[in-house]
């Protein structure tokens, strides 16, 4: 996983009043993001948003990151930050989580009803967070299946694009 180091440094500069001028707040954020994104299906890259410079909460000895109730660590989301030692406050920080993984992409326009052949697709690394769920990462899923609908060239192949082949 890659968290843009300069983003954490910028965040700490802007929020120096949140915590004692230390790297422990940045380290807590980094460790939280690493823990929450472990096991994702690919290479993870995280961009931290820039905090609002007008927000100036009371000094805090220890910042504790948390995931808000409805948030998920996927795409553009937010993480919460609360003071765990000192004044009682919490705020939110925008994050953008990218998950890059190899997937099957159509080499050319594919017609409905045709089985998938090896020369119909290529493997390409894409950001899964920018696409709907169900993108194929393994061609074995398409065995004994045919395309249920047309698929344009350059588009990732998805599970719902396939149906079992008709047996006559």
Report the location of each language-model feature:
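Mature, extracytoplasmic segments of signal peptide-bearing proteins
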Residues: 2-3, 17-168
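Bacterial N-terminal signal peptides
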Residues: 7-17
